[in-house]
Amino acid sequence: MSTSSFNKRSVALLTDLYEMTMAHGYFEEGRAETIVTFDVFYRQNPDNGGFSIFAGLEQIVEYINELHFSDDDIAYLRSLGLFSEPFLEYLHHFRFTGDIDAVPEGSIIYPNEPLITVTAPIIEAQLIETFLLTQVNHQSLIATKANRIVRAAQGRSVADMGARRAHNIDAAVYGARAAYIGGVNSTATALAGKAFGIPVVGTMAHSWIMFFDGEYDAFKRYAEIYGSSSVFLVDTYDTLKSGVPTAIRVAQEVLIPRGQRLLGVRIDSGDMAYLSKKVRALLDEAGLQDCKIMASNSLDERTITSIIAQGGCVDSYGVGERLITAYSDAKFGAVYKLAAIKQGDIFVPKIKLSENVGKITNPGRKRLYRVYSEKGHSIADLITCDTETVKDGAPFEYLSPEKPWAVRTFEHCTFRELLNPLFRNGQLVTKLPTLEEIRAYVRRQLDEEVWKEEQRFENPHIHYLDMSVKYYQMKMDLMKHHE
């Protein structure tokens, strides 16, 4: 099932009003067909991490393919009293006709490098800004957070259980998609399972136990219905004195006589490290060594790391609010900035300056490469002018923007261009990967390319974004021009 089957709303008006007023201004100026290039990039990894994960591209493709203004949209814009009738007629026939390049969904990404480039008539490029940023900012944030949690779990299963704490239904469903890209094994959100084919998982709520006269009746009835799929929630009254002993009793009296086994128990409160060790001992003593222990309750990468460090016996984690809201750093910060304007047959680079050095943009049309050592590790990313070429194994001079006086040379390296054609003249020109392929791509990069030092949570190694000498000089010339 595609995303469009989940969401049938018209989203042409999912744009900031100033995009519309600027578009109207370009139209009235007779500049509607001026070709420009915009870049999508972000400035800082969430949680001071070593990298982020790019997600949300499939939804952007669907949006571009379906983008048009309905009669109702036009009527609403007319009611604002801001726009001329010729402009509204232009919008009535609006379709995206430009070019888009993007890094593959699931790519490991770093600050200040272009993730998406849009080259199109100025109005088209302007009107799609808000939607592109909405998708990139949300899904990249959640995918990145999910991957931190998955890495903390060290191979133990992680389930997304955050829908009820998400900021709305879109955040719940698309958040589940992004979390799956980031590496979680399953989701508790049935709609996300239907929409994207994500494996779904569920146990029981405290209300099931409270509905019956006691834990024994609740567990017994559940076991009679679900057999070896049963996972009992054991902390409704007292985990060690009541919940686990009752779960063991039902396993012995109901499941084992039927040739079935208790799949697991879930702890949703208390000291997870302490309780999981005690629960494991009780289960093992009862001959239920194969019964899994699941933990939930406000978990994230830090609490999971702590549980494991203390010798906790948790086999799987259900992670909710701190995943689906990216609780510890709830912003991604991607922006959309003008990079070049076409004048005649050439693109003139544009730069945004700032008193804050971190907000000075990288101007012009550019290429982005990932640079690999002879052993296949990613050692840096490289921005060049779009007219420059690199060759595997050949020397290539570069510099770091932080140390521009030190010109260095890549030697015996291979280069992979990251920005790939997505749309040409408004038409999709590439086959999109499946969700499973995106998820596997994330895992493969982390296993084979990204240094472990970049993956640590505390003080991760910095992955450098270098520039060719020619590109850096062009940027400096532009900055001096605007002094």
Locate predicted features.
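Gly/Ser/Thr/Ala-enriched C-terminal appendages of enzymes
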Residues: 2-34, 38, 47-49, 299-483
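Buried, small/hydrophobic-residue-enriched core segments of structured protein domains
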Residues: 2-34, 44-46, 82-83, 88-97, ...
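Alpha-helix initiation/capping motif
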Residues: 16, 56, 69-73, 83-85, ...
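N-terminal, Lys/Arg-enriched amphipathic/low-complexity engagement segments
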Residues: 36-92
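Short amphipathic alpha-helical segments
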Residues: 56-59, 141, 434-438
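Short coil/turn segments at secondary-structure boundaries
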Residues: 75-76, 144-148, 162, 454-461
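Short hydrophobic alpha-helical runs that function as membrane-insertion/retention elements
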Residues: 202, 294, 315-318
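Active-site neighborhood of glycoside hydrolase catalytic domains
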Residues: 288, 292
